[in-house]
Amino acid sequence: MYAIVRDRGMQYRVEEGQALDIALLDAEPGSEIELGDVLLIGGEQPRVGTPTVDGAKVVATVLGTIKGDKIVVFRYKNKKRYRRRTGHRQEYTRVSISKIIVDADEQHVTGSMEGETNGA
């Protein structure tokens, strides 16, 4: 069982127990967050949202914050001896997917990934 969720403009394919790095959140480590924009629930009977699946949500536990890889920006002006080298490291929040809930009545869904194919 997997789900496609949307969080602040990014889409993620998530499964239960998976660790995921999302854009920085103002949340304490150990707290639970809810990803409500579920676009698709995959499994034996996939459900596609229009645009979201009604009543579906993904609950995740915040593990902490991390920094991404450094991006180096180098600017220069040709023939003028002007050079500037700066770097940037984006901060992310690492979360662990606790459960995928399909219906609003808190029905917890479990399932295996056997027999499913990756469309990518």
From Swiss-Prot:
The keyword Transferase does not apply. GO terms for biological process: translation. GO terms for cellular component: cytoplasm; ribonucleoprotein complex; ribosome. Keywords: Ribonucleoprotein, Ribosomal protein, RNA-binding, rRNA-binding. The keyword Cell membrane does not apply. GO terms for molecular function: rRNA binding; structural constituent of ribosome. InterPro entries: bL21-like (IPR028909), bL21-like_sf (IPR036164), Ribosomal_bL21 (IPR001787), Ribosomal_bL21_CS (IPR018258). It comes from the Bacteria. Part of the 50S ribosomal subunit. Contacts protein L20. This protein binds to 23S rRNA in the presence of protein L20. Belongs to the bacterial ribosomal protein bL21 family. This is Large ribosomal subunit protein bL21. It comes from Roseiflexus sp. (strain RS-1). The lineage of its organism: Bacteria, Bacillati, Chloroflexota, Chloroflexia, Chloroflexales. The gene is rplU.
